């Protein structure tokens, strides 16, 4: 009995465990089947999606391929059309060439037949001409060559007579027309250029506020006046003229330097030899700058471009030069404008003519090489500073020193004469006076050791400044005598000329 109680629970436990295992297995199998079905469904969906993607890509690729094939077919068709058109054109051209060739052959055959006919007629005419010539020779008693010569001589005489008559008519008409046209051009040129009548003097009047300043300008025992005259080379005349000091000298540049220096000294109030030298040095630089500025303004006003800076400086320096009393810069501007107008009237280049007119008297500016005519010196300067050959020739030929090679040269010559020939434009006595003073200075400068020379008091005194390191005190007297003798032998002058040789030694030190 007890054994039954033990066996029954064990059997029950075993049966329960078996049932539980069977139930678990059933559940697991059901879950497995469910998961398998889900996996199969998902696999089917994925498969369908992939199939759709593949199909879509296939359709896209197919469409692209069909499009490319269509485009290629279109290109092939276009090329085939062009080839057919070209072939048709070539066939038409070939037919046209064949037709023209046939026409040429026909014309050639026709020409050949006509040429044969002409040749035959020519032979007949030659025979007939020969018969006629023989007949005429028999009648006239002259050969054909003799008859030709007589006819040629007769025609020559007749042609010469007619040509001579025709040439005379042309020459007379040209003379009348040329004279009339030349007068017309000159009158038109003068009318179109406005000018002023200006005569350069050899003195400048410096006005002062009161006569008290005269004493300060003169200085103790005249030392300020002497220092100013030595520094500028200008004679300072202080007389009884109220509120005025006269600056006398033939060189306008020196007079302008003296005037500006006096103006600054009077304004500053400090007037003594050291200050005078300082101011004169400063004013010389100022005048040089003004010369360059004047040259630049002149070329800009006239529209002349591309000049060398040294030529521009020389043009500015013309402001302080005169020719027979006529201001050289005004004369050059006037000549340039006249040249431009006359060149325009003659159908030539007015810019080149104006350039040549402006530069024609440039040889009067340099102080060196005085033995050369100013036209030749001007031509050399233009060549040196790379002016064109026609400009150089016009400058050199305007006084007939060289041969005129272009039409610019006679224009410059005529306009120079027109400018100088105006009533009141020039005064030859002034030019002769200035030339005499300049020759006086150049004569003294030719001696070794001479640094500067100044002709003052209308050429009655010549001051010669020598280098202290080159000439001693004993030689100054000999130099003065030699210069005086050379002036007596080589120059013509009124009265007498006083030669003053100045030798000055300076020792300068600075206290620091």
Curated annotation (Swiss-Prot):
It is an enzyme of class 3 (hydrolase). PROSITE patterns: HD, KH_TYPE_1. One of its GO terms (molecular function) is RNA endonuclease activity. This is Ribonuclease Y. Gene3D superfamilies: Hypothetical protein af1432, K Homology domain, type 1. GO terms for biological process: mRNA catabolic process. The lineage of its organism: Bacteria, Pseudomonadati, Bacteroidota, Bacteroidia, Bacteroidales. It is a single-pass membrane protein. Belongs to the RNase Y family. It comes from Parabacteroides distasonis (strain ATCC 8503 / DSM 20701 / CIP 104284 / JCM 5825 / NCTC 11152). Endoribonuclease that initiates mRNA decay.
């Amino acid at each position: 009995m007890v054994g039954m109680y033990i066996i029954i629970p064990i059997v029950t436990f075993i049966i329960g465990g078996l049932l539980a295992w069977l139930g678990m297995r059933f559940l697991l199998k059901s879950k497995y089947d469910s998961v398998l079905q889900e996996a199969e469904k998902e696999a089917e969906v994925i498969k369908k999606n992939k199939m759709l993607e593949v199909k879509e890509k296939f359709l896209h690729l197919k469409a692209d391929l069909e499009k490319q094939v269509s485009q290629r077919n279109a290109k092939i068709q276009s090329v085939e059309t062009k080839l057919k058109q070209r072939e048709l054109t070539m066939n038409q051209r070939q037919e046209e060439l064949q037709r023209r060739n046939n026409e040429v052959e026909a014309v050639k055959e026709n020409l050949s037949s006509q040429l044969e006919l002409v040749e035959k007629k020519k032979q007949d005419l030659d025979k007939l001409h020969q018969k006629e010539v023989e007949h005429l020779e028999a009648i006239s008693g002259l050969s054909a060559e003799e008859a030709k010569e007589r006819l040629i001589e007769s025609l020559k005489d007749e042609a010469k007579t007619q040509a001579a008559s025709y040439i005379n008519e042309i020459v007379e008409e040209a003379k009348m027309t040329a004279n009339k046209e030349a007068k017309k051009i000159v009158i038109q040129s003068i009318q179109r250029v406005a000018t002023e009548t200006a005569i350069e003097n050899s003195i400048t009047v410096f006005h002062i506020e009161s006569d008290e300043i005269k004493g300060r300008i003169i200085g103790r025992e005249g030392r300020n006046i002497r220092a100013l005259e030595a520094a500028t080379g200008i004679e300072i005349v202080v007389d009884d003229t109220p509120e005025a000091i006269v600056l006398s000298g033939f060189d306008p540049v020196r007079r302008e330097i003296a005037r500006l220096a006096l103006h600054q000294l009077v304004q500053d109030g400090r007037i003594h030899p050291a200050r005078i030298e300082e101011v004169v040095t400063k004013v010389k630089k100022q005048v040089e700058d003004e010369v360059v500025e004047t040259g630049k303004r002149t070329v800009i006003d006239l529209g002349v471009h591309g000049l060398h800076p040294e030529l521009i400086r020389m043009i500015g320096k013309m402001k302080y030069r005169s020719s027979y009393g006529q201001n050289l810069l005004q004369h050059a501007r006037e000549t340039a404008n006249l040249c431009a107008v006359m060149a325009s009237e003659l159908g030539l280049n007015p810019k080149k003519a104006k350039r040549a007119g402006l530069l024609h008297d440039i040889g009067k500016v340099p102080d060196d090489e005085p033995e050369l005519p100013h036209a030749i010196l001007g031509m050399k300067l233009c060549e040196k500073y790379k002016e064109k050959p026609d400009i150089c020739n016009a400058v050199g030929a305007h006084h007939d020193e060289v041969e005129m090679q272009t039409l610019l040269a006679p224009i410059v010559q005529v306009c120079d004469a027109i400018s100088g020939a105006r009533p009141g434009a020039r005064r030859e006595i002034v030019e002769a006076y200035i030339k005499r003073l300049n020759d006086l200075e150049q004569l003294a400068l030719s001696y070794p050791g001479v640094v500067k020379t100044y002709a003052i008091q209308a050429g009655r005194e010549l001051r010669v400044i020598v280098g202290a390191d080159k000439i001693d005190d004993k030689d100054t007297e000999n130099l003065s005598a030699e210069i005086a003798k050379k002036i007596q032998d080589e120059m013509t002058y009124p009265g007498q000329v006083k030669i003053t040789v100045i030798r000055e030694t300076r020792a300068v030190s600075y206290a620091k």
